[in-house]
Amino acid sequence: MLKFTVHKTSGGARRGTLELNHGTVETPVFQPVGTYGSVKAMSPVELNDIGAQIILGNTFHLWLRPGLEIVEQFGGLHEFIGWDKPILTDSGGFQVFSLSDMRKLTEEGCTFQSPINGDKLFLSPEISMKIQTVLNSDIVMQLDECTPGQVDHATAQKSLQMSLRWAERSRRAFDDLKNPNALFGIVQGNLYTDLRQESLEGLMQVGFDGIAIGGLSVGEPKPEMYRMLTELKDMLPADKPHYLMGVGTPEDLVHGVANGVDMFDCVMPTRNARNGWIFTQWGDVKIKNARYKDDKKPLDEECACYACRNFSRAYLHHLHRVGEILGARLNTIHNLFYYQELMREMRKAIEEDRFEDFRLEFAAKRARSVN
């Protein structure tokens, strides 16, 4: 089930709702990444407290561990991990294609060695749909082929055409399995506008509940990613949710929303938090820096997260320097809260038709740098 409604626009930005089997999501939305069924360093209660509406699970990794049999015994991923809100699962394609020296790609699918024990495994559109049906994720992604950051036109076209054939197979398998959830197609085509259009037109013929933009933030220069988003803005169907996969920084989120993107996911706020890189409205904090060793201020005096309400930069600096796990947890709570707050602010700005003003204020604040 999926019902998507756009309630308000401001320039190219859209404010909507996404009704799914496990609840309604307010868009634009950021999805924390829970690779193995867990958002690193966060409990489901903490995710709920910071305002997370939907999380992402990784089909490839959950297939390998704990395996479908275990998840199926629990009745699906929601029950297994104790999360009652929506979940999106990727198709497993990106992880498989990252194993470039351990895989063989054919029209049927991809044969590869398990990175865990070396077993020979095979992933096809049909198998990906079966896995995601067992997981019972609210949003299922088609299996596609991912190209590196920059390839020639012919290579990109050959790849996207196979992805379109796999899109048709994903759609058929999804329907044959009588999966009651939503299925998204993925636009590929590298950095070539004509190929992106070809991909999108093919997906529209197949018929999907939402459209994802894949193959960006994979090593291409940032201006090229922004150019492609701008060019895609007017091509994407207005009545379907637009999902930018694997992106990104706070600036990327604002730029994406300005270009009609409704959904994002990225490991950046959690991964950076564990490495002591913290995002705030005033710029980024590298908490390991000696300048913070006796700083009594919170990370952001205007932030309402648990870390900022209770702890100083000096304490977070200390925790990071001695390698205490609490430091990684507090940094993660803050970063994810900041990302959720940024999305809340963008939703409010769109509702009040002042998104462009918000965008200018956001850039000015982030440029000021942390005091």
From Swiss-Prot:
Protein name: Queuine tRNA-ribosyltransferase
Highest classification ranks of the organism: Bacteria, Pseudomonadati, Pseudomonadota, Betaproteobacteria, Neisseriales
Top enzyme category: transferase
Gene encoding the protein: tgt
Organism whose genome encodes this protein: Chromobacterium violaceum (strain ATCC 12472 / DSM 30191 / JCM 1249 / CCUG 213 / NBRC 12614 / NCIMB 9131 / NCTC 9757 / MK)
Pathway terms, separated by semicolons: tRNA modification; tRNA-queuosine biosynthesis
Single GO cellular component term: cytosol
Family note: Belongs to the queuine tRNA-ribosyltransferase family.
Gene3D superfamilies on file: Queuine tRNA-ribosyltransferase-like (3.20.20.105)
Functional note: Catalyzes the base-exchange of a guanine (G) residue with the queuine precursor 7-aminomethyl-7-deazaguanine (PreQ1) at position 34 (anticodon wobble position) in tRNAs with GU(N) anticodons (tRNA-Asp, -Asn, -His and -Tyr). Catalysis occurs through a double-displacement mechanism. The nucleophile active site attacks the C1' of nucleotide 34 to detach the guanine base from the RNA, forming a covalent enzyme-RNA intermediate. The proton acceptor active site deprotonates the incoming PreQ1, allowing a nucleophilic attack on the C1' of the ribose to form the product.
